[in-house]
Amino acid sequence: MIKKAIILCGGTGSRMFPLTHSVNKQLLPILDKPMFYYPLSLLMLCGIREYVFIINKNQENNFSKALGNENDLGIRVKFVVQESPLGLPDAFSISRKFIKNQSIAMILGDNFFFGSMLSPLIRKSFKLKSGCNIYIYPSNKPSSYGVVEFNKKNKIKKIVEKPKKTNSNSIITGLYTFDKNVVNFTKKLKPSKRKELEIVDLINLFPPSTRAGGQDD
């Protein structure tokens, strides 16, 4: 059963400049709450109580103020600084002391998830014993994302990052769950052409029989 989660709140937020000139994108307000509150709330609804926030340098105080008293929320939070943007899987490497050889969930701090059956679906996937779970959604422009391709038995065949051609319209979202092997698998990754570790490459290291996809319409 997954009991811990990583929330990714780093990055440069370059596409939202100048709003992100002096503050992380995930701290920007959406209605009456900072952006990161929404993915955090989703995981809290699913029973997660221990978190590590991956943040940029000199941002811990800002996130602490935005979060408020974690005891009032009934959660425990640690902050880990990502010194440079080395890709999503780097979060597992720098959080290995937090993970402690356990299964873990990871969510992007700037993503929004909504659906009538979403929480039950996620709770079910949090019973993960081995392998990994990814959450997929249909897209009209799949080539702009990581695309999940299936075999004839509707099992995940492979995941391709921004393919030029594909017969699938299922894209990966910003929520993942991995078993205790994730830290060791991350060590096997090599930087892509972008000079970053790619989440797609990490998922593809898990045996096909242990990869599962979830979708809430």
Range-by-range predicted roles:
Residues 1-7, 15-21, 28-29, 33-108, ...:
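Conserved N-terminal catalytic core of the sugar/cofactor nucleotidyltransferase
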Residues 11, 110, 138:
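Active-site glycine-centered loops adjacent to acidic/histidine catalytic or metal-binding residues
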Residues 11, 58, 180-181:
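Alpha-helix/helix-capping structural signal
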Residues 27, 148-150:
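A structural signal for short hydrophobic beta-strand segments in well-ordered beta-sheet cores
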Residues 85-88, 141-142, 165:
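A short acidic, often aromatic-flanked loop/helix-cap motif at beta-alpha or helix-coil junctions
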Residues 105, 119, 126, 155-207, ...:
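Catalytic-core segments of class I nucleotidyltransferases/pyrophosphorylases
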Residues 115-143:
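Conserved donor-nucleotide/metal-binding helix-loop-beta segment in metal-dependent transferases, i.e.
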Residues 210-212:
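Ala/Thr-enriched low-complexity intrinsically disordered regions
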